[in-house]
Amino acid sequence: RENEADLIIAAEFATPEAINFMATHARGLICAPLSPERADTLQLPLMTSVNRENMSTAFTVSVDAAHDITTGISAGERSLTIRTLADPKATVNDFVQPGHVFPLRAVPGGVLRRAGHTEATIDLVRMAGLQPAGVCCEIMKDDGTMARIGDLGPFQKKYGLKACTVAQLIEHRRAQEKQIRLVETVKMPTDYGDFTCHLYESHLDGALHLALVHGEISADKPTLVRVHSECLT
């Protein structure tokens, strides 16, 4: 989407050293992606009701932790704010607004709905079994322009970092996750024989899909499939 490279960590592991590394070596804007559920729990409103940003990045109001903070900008204090965002016991009262950390609200469904770094961050921490809060920071080259995938080799080697693309994450999720749930199954007798009708709901957008099945489906035999995008005929 942005065609930029980001450093990403889980928010609960946001040590002062990690935030200082991002500020020193990545040098982009340090943001804190949150799942929509987490953003709602912390009552973080969007920064603007009319998002005109090129990529529709969903910035919420900026925050600082409400306790043990002076100005909020140091690596240590930003790391405290970020870890508090990930703390499942934290509430809206544990933050002040505005602040020096920029939460980003991910869309439901993650990278399968929006192929952005916000969603990639949340998908990765969820896959790791961690709290749905992360940290991301764009990587800038020495000349101040944004690093692309072809620029990352020396950076990765120097600091011992692993890399993946949003496209790889999308491919992995499509291969490993079930994207629908069975809602109901009914028998459907017709003039052309007895069918079974299955109703499925998409986890991504709530869309409903019908599958009409005639006969027995066997895993060791090919099955004839016809797809209708609008109506059943």
Where are these regions (language model features)?
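Catalytic domains of riboflavin
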Residues: 1-233
